[in-house]
């Protein structure tokens, strides 16, 4: 039910897709050569499969849900997407923003996207254990709650198989936060 599946389904109905990805550094190719991040790989995969789709990567390194919320209306109007992917929230947690605010911002962005007729995919994140088990659980649960309430698909953890894989250090840049280019095909498979 992710981007690829939705675009392939629509292609069968002969409708060109306009995919908007609103994310943070994990989607903005932070520290990578241009064209090697999962969003660029999505567009390449769709083209290879001859699925008519335009992918707009509106991701900004360091972005938070308040930042995404402030930019969303202009992006929806400008690009008129048929599919919207929201990959935000990780920086909210890293900055200590209240979880309730993150949840409310995500819900608002989903609602606004749905109001245009776009299908929405919510891309979740998880916090490392040093944030505490209770905080990590509540953080992951906010994505689940928004997806359930708005009846949209959820990718529970964009970095599944990367951050929790057998050798995560090998797949991350020296900062330990941003995946290397080698991890981005797996990230695409996750969405």
Language-model region placement:
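Serine-esterase "nucleophile elbow" of acetyl-processing enzymes
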Residues: 9-61, 71-80
């Amino acid at each position: 039910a992710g981007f690829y599946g939705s675009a392939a389904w629509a292609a069968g109905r002969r409708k060109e897709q306009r995919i908007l990805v609103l994310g943070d550094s994990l989607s903005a190719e932070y520290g990578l050569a241009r064209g090697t991040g999962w969003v660029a790989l999505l567009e390449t995969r769709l083209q290879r499969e001859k699925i008519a789709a335009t992918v707009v990567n509106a991701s900004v390194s360091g972005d938070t849900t308040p930042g995404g919320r402030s930019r969303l209306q202009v992006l929806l109007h400008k690009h008129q997407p048929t599919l919207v992917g929201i990959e935000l929230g990780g920086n909210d947690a890293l900055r200590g923003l209240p979880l309730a605010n993150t949840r409310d911002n995500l819900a608002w962005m989903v609602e606004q996207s749905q109001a245009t007729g776009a299908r929405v995919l919510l891309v979740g994140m998880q916090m490392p254990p040093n944030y505490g088990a209770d905080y990590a659980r509540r953080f992951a649960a906010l994505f689940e709650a928004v997806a359930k309430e708005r009846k949209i698909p959820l990718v529970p953890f964009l970095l599944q198989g990367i951050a929790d894989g057998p050798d995560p250090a090998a797949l991350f840049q020296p900062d330990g936060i941003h995946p290397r280019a080698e991890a981005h095909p797996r990230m695409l498979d996750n969405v």
